[in-house]
Regions:
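Membrane-embedded alpha-helical signal segments
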Residues: 1-172
């Protein structure tokens, strides 16, 4: 990890300042050049949140239905919760995904986001919710039959660009 760009940022933990934490993740992921990482900021329960996931690796409908809508629909008593307890409060009372846990380390958040999970960062909270939202193309990258290549790679892609990128992410 020493020769990786932003390795020092990966060793850090969430600060609880939503703007600073999202900017750190944007730097680690190389935004705006890396357009596959989605940052979806929104307000719910009287505080600010941001969902972060990899397009093509996470099911966007699952993110919308079980995370964004669930947080918007559940405002009852959320403003009375202490900032540090917001993640646990949402985990127990709002999020409808059973495979969810709290995480505070950037390295683990980045690893899981790239693997298809969604991180929910919450303003004032040093823990993020990490939720199972994986869903991607399931075929293996295969050799082409119709095009024989003498030198070089022989893997073939016939789907959309987004699907092909997702297949390569899983392959690597």
């Amino acid at each position: 990890m020493a020769d990786m760009p932003h390795a020092d940022l990966l060793r850090g933990e969430l600060t609880g300042a939503l703007e600073k934490d999202t900017q750190t993740l944007r730097t680690i992921f190389g935004l705006p050049e890396n357009a596959d990482i989605v940052f979806r900021p929104f307000d719910a329960g009287g505080f600010s949140l941001c969902a972060v996931y990899t397009e093509g690796m996470a099911q966007s409908d699952k993110v919308a239905d079980f995370i964004l809508r669930a947080c918007h629909a559940f405002d009852a008593g959320a403003d009375a919760v202490a900032p540090q307890a917001r993640a646990e409060y949402l985990l127990k009372n709002a999020v409808c995904i059973p495979q969810a846990r709290l995480e505070e380390r950037f390295a683990e958040l980045v690893r899981q986001i790239l693997g298809g999970m969604t991180a929910l960062l919450i303003d004032g909270c040093e823990d993020a919710l990490l939720m199972e939202t994986r869903g991607f193309e399931k075929r293996a990258v295969q050799r082409t039959i119709s095009e024989s290549v003498v030198v070089g790679s022989q893997e073939g892609f016939v789907e959309s660009l987004r699907t092909n990128i997702t297949l390569m992410r899983r392959y690597v």
